[in-house]
Amino acid sequence: MDFASVLGKSEAHQRTIIHLDMDYFYAQVEEIRDPTLRSKALGIQQKNIVVTCNYVARAKGVTKLMLIAEAQRICPDLVLVNGEDLAPYRQMSQRIFDLLLNYTPLVEKLGFDENFMDVTALVELRQAHVAEALLRPPVGHTYPADGTPLSNCDCGCAQRLAIGTRIAQEIREELKLRLGITCCAGIAYNKLLAKLVGSSHEPNQQTVLVSTYAEQFMRELGDLKRVTGIGQKTQCLLLEAGMSSVEQLQQCDMDVMRKKFGFETATRLRDLAFGRDTSLVRPSGKPKTIGMEDACKPISVRTDVEERFRMLLKRLVEQVAEDGRVPIAIKVVLRKFDSQKKSSHRETKQANILPSLFKTSMCPGETGVSKVQLADGAQDKLLKIVMRLFERIVDMSKPFNITLLGLAFSKFQERKVGSSSIANFLIKKADLEVQSITSLTNTSLTSPTAESPTSDECAFRSSPTTFKPSDQFYRRRATTASPVPMLLDNGSESAATNSDFSDFSETEVEPSPKKSRIGRLLVSKRSRLAADVGDSAAEVASPSKLRVCDLRLNSRDSEKDFPMSTTPSTSTSAPAPRFRTVQPPNTLLQRIDGSLRFVTTRTASRLSSNASSTASSPLPSPMDDSIAMSAPSTTTLPFPSPTTTAVVTSSSSTATCDALTNIVCPAGVDAEVFKELPVELQTELIASWRSSLVAAVEQTNGTGAATSAAIASGAPATATTASGQKNTLYRYFLRNK
């Protein structure tokens, strides 16, 4: 069967559409579960209303959406079954959908109990058979009921609709035989007419519409609210325009309609009035979101909210287990009641979650069928995430009234069963732990101890290169392990797929952020400078090749940075670049007069001729400025030695304090906070920063062995001394160490 050609048929009378509506669905499912209820007046209760009832109860005056008290007054022998748990109805709906797929893949679900089917391809297939080609009377009822034959239309749709009635009859019989459920069916050439004509005769019956009587059928509907696609608000607007029936809408002045509704809406309403509908039957796949909401009396206590979320989460996980996919996002829905304004409004927050919170196992006895379950301890972690989202919506310092709570899982992904996924072989934990660069912008430096992430904080991490942005200390950074480092936009807060705790108001997956034009230009400039930097420097630029303590600290603001080239900079007020690369400066170490000094390649060549040229060195290191104040020559940049720092006199201590007070701090360090630190701590910080630069330069220029020997023969290196003790830098600035 050529189903692709069916989608292109939007002309009049070319398609054959079947609409199936299950009879009193919730109540019928309960009758199937308990056959003794078939002869009794049965109502399905949700909260304080009867959401639906069987035909025995309807015969006694009970209607849908009637209050429980009123229904029991009208029908004292009414049997009520709690229908708040939708799991049995959801399972039956899926079984119905699976059965319909045996006839055509073009099946569109409309709630639990309704389905559209485009059987055009199946009808064409049966038309090829001689027995079916003969014009046989349709099965079931026909509109109009005066005996008008389907052949009243000469476009050839009569035979197609007649075959469609036989297909609908076969489907209804199979549903009754295999699932024990009955339904009504409507057959027409479009979705709108098929749905409306199917309700003409119920329960457990079917009706076909003669195509040429579509306008008359719509006119006889009378009330506008019976037309699918016209809601309560639209009906009120039509009443204001003087139209209360379908017939009046058919005869309306289109100029008046366009002024009131606009061209598109006015045209759509006019088409609905005449039964015109070109919408296609869109095959339903697995849902993008699985959610659940619970309306309640006003809640104003946090513990009550947490308990209701716990119940919702437990029921929601059961639905995920049936679905078989793993969600990577969870959304909280709240309806807050304003007692002063006497109004309610909804608010939502969403957060990404780790797939590792779920585990997949094979169902026993069923080949190829997997079941998704929560991992050990995952429910408590998810509940903590939910409550954090709740506290982002509700100000806990003020009174609140919650009248509805909801949870939803989204961003589903298929998960392979077992541990043989290729990702398990390509990812190493050691590599992942170093591929992050911490920003120190807008941080609080008052805590002297590092905090280790708790288990629930780990659940927020969607990737090892991200941190929890709910705490301003963390800023998202990402790098690659390629020789050319990724440009980091210090002002970007996008990339929701990499965030650990991202807030959204919608459930759609956000697209990946595009690279800016300046980013592409800087990447091009970086590639042209590869010859200057050399292959070894490129390797050092990879975060996976460096220790975390060797990575310099970045800031989100515009600050001085290492230059990207060896060209000397003579400008003292050049703006700092917005984008940064994790790239050490192109410098070399020279041993002059028995001490280590920082000089650039170009400065080294001019050192003998111009001793003051170091002042224009392309390495604007803040440490250079601080050391230059106490050094005997402007061309020397001696490294501080721990041994000389430990033994100081009162006069030298005063000089050191003055020098440290005027130091220009490196990128990412607050100068005011630095000045408040003890003198020995300031000295240690400077030594640690310089040792990191030394290590980077040694690896860049291939002089690691020679420099190490030189350091060993002279004063002991600070990095070596600090290796035996905890680096104070990370005690004050890093919380994820």
Curated annotation (Swiss-Prot):
Q: Where is the signal peptide?
A: none
The record's annotation in CDD domains points to: PolY_Pol_iota
Q: Name one Pfam family in it.
A: IMS
Domain UmuC span(s) in chain numbering: 17-231
Please classify the protein's predominant subcellular localization into one broad category: nucleus
Q: What does this protein do?
A: Error-prone DNA polymerase specifically involved in DNA repair. Plays an important role in translesion synthesis, where the normal high-fidelity DNA polymerases cannot proceed and DNA synthesis stalls. Favors Hoogsteen base-pairing in the active site. Inserts the correct base with higher fidelity opposite an adenosine template. Exhibits low fidelity and efficiency opposite a thymidine template, where it will preferentially insert guanosine. Forms a Schiff base with 5'-deoxyribose phosphate at abasic sites, but may not have lyase activity.
Under which name does UniProt file this protein? DNA polymerase iota
Organism phylogeny: Eukaryota, Metazoa, Ecdysozoa, Arthropoda, Hexapoda
